Swiss-Prot record:
Phosphoprotein keyword on record: yes
Tissue-specific expression: High levels in brain, lower in spleen and lung.
Key words, A-Z: Acetylation, GTPase activation, Metal-binding, Phosphoprotein, Repeat, Zinc, Zinc-finger
Modified residues (N-acetylalanine): A2
GO molecular function: calcium channel regulator activity; GTPase activator activity; zinc ion binding
Role: Inhibitory regulator of the Ras-cyclic AMP pathway. May bind inositol tetrakisphosphate (IP4).
Modified residues (Phosphotyrosine): Y66
Domain Ras-GAP residues, every copy: 346-561
Descriptive protein name: Ras GTPase-activating protein 3
Pfam families attached to this UniProt entry: BTK, C2, PH, RasGAP
Record domain PH: where: 576-677
Amino acid sequence: MAVEEEGLRVFQSVRIKIGEAKNLPSYPGPNKMRDCYCTVNLDQEEVFRTKIVEKSLCPFYGEDFYCEIPRSFRHLSFYIFDRDVFRRDSIIGKVAIQKEDLQRYHNRDTWFQLQHVDADSEVQGKVHLELRLSEVITDTGVVCHKLAARIFECQGLPIVNGQCDPYATVTLAGPFRSEAKKTKVKKKTNNPQFDEVFYFEVTRPCSYSKKSHFDFEEEDVDKLEIRVDLWNASNLKFGDEFLGELRLPLKILRHSSSYEAWYFLQPRDNGNKSLKPDDLGSLRLNVVYTEDHVFSSEYYSPLRDLLLKSADVEPVSASAAHILGEVCRDKQEAAIPLVRLLLHYGRVVPFISAIASAEVKRTQDPNTIFRGNSLTSKCIDETMKLAGMHYLHVTLKPTIEEICQSHKSCEIDPVKLKDGENLENNMESLRQYVDRIFTVITKSGVSCPTVMCDIFFSLREAAAKRFQDDLDVRYTAVSSFIFLRFFAPAILSPNLFQLTPHHTDPQTSRTLTLISKTIQTLGSLSKSKSASFKESYMATFYEFFNEQKYADAVKNFLDLISSSGRRDPKSIEQPILLKEGFMIKRAQGRKRFGMKNFKKRWFRLTNHEFTYQKSKGDQPLCNIPIENILAVERLEEESFRMKNMFQVIQPERALYIQANNCVEAKDWIDILTKVSQCNQKRLTVFHPSAYLNGHWLCCRASSDTAAGCTPCTGGLPANIQLDIDGDRETERIYSLFNLYMGKLEKMQEACGSKSVYDGPEQEEYSTFVIDDPQETYKTLKQVIAGVGTLEQEHAQYRRDKFKKTRYGSQEHPIGDKSFQNYIRQQSEISTHSI
């Protein structure tokens, strides 16, 4: 799902590493320690929460979070909470990064000072206001000026303690006067529609005879202002809560009798500034924010075609895809969009086979094969993440969940044993876990995804051809990925592979570390097992597995997953879990009478059906076959005055569901839409609002079977692979090429230098792999031309958008400093281009 903007789609995403907090204020009690967690918020909407770290003022979280951002936002915020068992969790402090500042911290570990949180720091939202100055004749026949202040609506007000019942006060204030008026309270909404007008007398009637038409006294104008304050009506004894304010000097009407615009709400001038930022501690974050502006598909044809034929270029180092890996600062930065694009078009196996073969030819020692962070390694890693996640979950998740729930101690380091623990018992528990995981892995070969098997086959063939005297290299070439870079990391950090929702507790983490080390060594088939461990206790423990049957099992498994033409005939019939989690659903109304209330349920989606039950593991209360899903669409907030709602439309009724936040709502809508995309009876129109009180709220039709009034969203073509958009990935690659244009040009120079000079290579060119200077130069020329054409399209789009942009519109309210900077930059660009 993307924001549509006149011929192009805008995608936003963010990848966050929440590291640790330092020097949090101590708890005011004898213990002084705190139980803290961190939340990630789009403005104030929570979209992710870390685990709770107990009894620490320097909690380490070590959690990663990625999401597609489905709406506009101003701040990416992080709140540190202190858990309270008996009361509401209290906020220690927050970090708020403006959207426009995210690039300053792009992919860098940064320490941020925690800021104090109060009503002023939480101000958000915008207000639509009109001021109109007019002349009126009083009862005595005297003409005077009246000011009409019309407040239309507000959007995106903060929600306070789970509710928002807003009202506004409109005040005309000056040195010697203050006249306030108040709107009605709007219940249960943070997007109130007020549409109320308030009138104020601006000048004395006697002043009219001294001034010309609309030329009222300057001293009054300069000193008067309109102030709009938003409040949340509260029943608490502490009074109503401040939501934000707007101050407008009346002199804006000096040149026009009316003024209408949208404004961002601001904190009060006298906001609480008592605490210094460093009083609250700091938080370490790594944030990667990406915004892609994607044109229609034909714009990307030249660059996309160049990338897709990379596997056929001789040598492969002269291909566009390989060049991308050469110029990017981080190979993974290149691998992510590259693999997704090639996987989408069925070209990932030929390309990886080509670059793997080239890398093997450059490798001198079979013991170091595929051990570096090369483009080959990163591309295979990314392919395994995309294609192998379900395989990984089916293989490991049941045992990992059992380990996390059992909390058995498996510590085998005598130095780290706790009082009362028995070394032999711990060693036996660990041995059983390792044995179980080793068995499920080595028996899972038939379930390994085909694309992974095809890649492993090419690795095996290339390694065996290069090192013909080493009989084990055909195994180590494959095990270096499937064990060392797939299974072992997933066991070590299961949260990074969605095997657990959060980082595991210290004891479980230690158990998983020991298991991961052992599995990694078993899979590596190294000649000297004991020498693989630095710790003597690990060498002792490994004696349990120093039998030929374990090596044979590994080799049989590696043979199976690297065999040519291997296919899993059962893979299509197997139910694949795609997504699950708690949401709130509205009763479907199978009975004609009775309350249709909202209930929290555990939802589960597979490639066969969509179900919900009371709790995870219970029997389903409702099963919806995928073929019965006719459409999945958003539900307008006005239907039930609830945010983040969507509807799953079936032949007889619609199931109304509320997700926990906007990110989850987008994820569920996307995956439900994609999994039901091929249904033959999919609807073309739908009702965007609910059927309540005998009619549809959107079109007022009275029949509950009336045809929809709004076209269904198009979704993606039926043959598209899940979660991959080829045009978006090409746009991402274009952005990388454009970012590293200087390196592309430097690489061109290196090709020219190599073509005419056979002497020692210049140091500045030595970082590039250039096997054929002429072929590489030819590709570089095509890449630079394709990137240049796309850059011209982007520049034209920016110019067109700038011409249409109005400061003070609903999209660009007044009060956004970053937008003012954007206006200034675009003005300079436009002037320069002229």
